[in-house]
Amino acid sequence: MKKIIALTLLLCMVFALTSMTAYAAEDIGDTLVLYSTMTEKDLDALISGFNEVYPDCEIEVVSGTIGETTSRIAAEADNPQGDVTWGGLADSDGMQYAELFEEWVSDESANAIEGYSTPNGIYSMDHLSTVVFAINTELEKELGLDIRSYADLLDPKLEGKIIFSNPNSSSAAWNNLCNIMSVFGNDSEESWDYIEKLMKNLVISDSSSNCFKLVEQGEYVVGLTYEDGAIKLIEQGADDHFTMRYPADGASASAFGMAVIKNCKHPEAAKALVNWVCSAEGCSYIAQYLKTLRMTNKDTVYGESLLPATEDIKWVVRDVPYLTEHKAEILDHWNDLLLEVQG
């Protein structure tokens, strides 16, 4: 009996180790070029976790906004310099960037939370990004404000004191614009009436990270941004003058993902990276490393997290198919209105 028990335990250990290193069985090469919109700490999490499984594969990172990275991929189409991209590819993109990427998704997409699997057969979705207001609480107090809702952003005291990125090139800005439309009614008169009023207080930045960094530094009172960026500053000790708040009217999230660049030089390594990130093992590693990111794999183990529990946030339903189908028209309307309001 003791021998049987010992053998059973040994087999269980072998199975567990095999499962944890399932992606390490293949030779994927020693080089991988990653284009990414993610933060430095996000990249640290991905690289350190991936290299535990594939220690011989060196990842070179090229960072930029989604507009910059996709433009670069398009310009390099005849001789691709990148292999895979992470971040900025949103579930509302539709087929906008389809010609840039391989028609391939990770098998792990089948394990995504319902509603957050691949939207187009090209993106493998790995994490969620929820909209928040980044607020400099010292400046807010000086102005005598208590900023909680979208209506609060229209206060004349905030003219030129709200920073927002460009929704034409920033997925974070598009995410926030989608949330406004989810609250006020998609491409409705009420939505555009609100947006026109909001534009009077906005300063548009080329960088989505400025929408939390420059708020924390005191250059702006409010930034319309995303929780995983803002929470990192709080984690680093900025909570004595900086906070993030979910819109009292309701918050929603975009799913963001990865895609393999068409005709890339290292497809095996690119697919191995996507598979690992989207797996329960990869999602759990990144979530526990960062403590600031919500992942898509339904089997993610979070451990300690700095983010509030899902049930503590007021959520609003986002009509992703509608926003995807009408994205070009919405952006055209945004551009025309911004020119009219700000000149």
Annotated model-derived regions:
Residues 110-111, 129, 193-198, 204, ...:
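Periplasmic-binding protein-like
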Residues 91-96, 221-241, 290:
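A ligand-binding cleft/hinge motif common to bilobed small-molecule-binding domains
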Residues 252, 256, 261-318:
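Mature extracytoplasmic/periplasmic domains
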Residues 316-343:
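Conserved C-terminal helix/tail region of periplasmic/extracytoplasmic solute-binding proteins
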Residues 8-16:
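Bacterial N-terminal signal peptides
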Residues 33-44, 67, 80-219:
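Extracytoplasmic ligand-binding site segments that recognize negatively charged/polar headgroups
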Residues 15-27:
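Sec-dependent signal peptide cleavage junction
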Residues 6, 25-84:
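Conserved N-terminal structural module of periplasmic/extracytoplasmic solute-binding proteins
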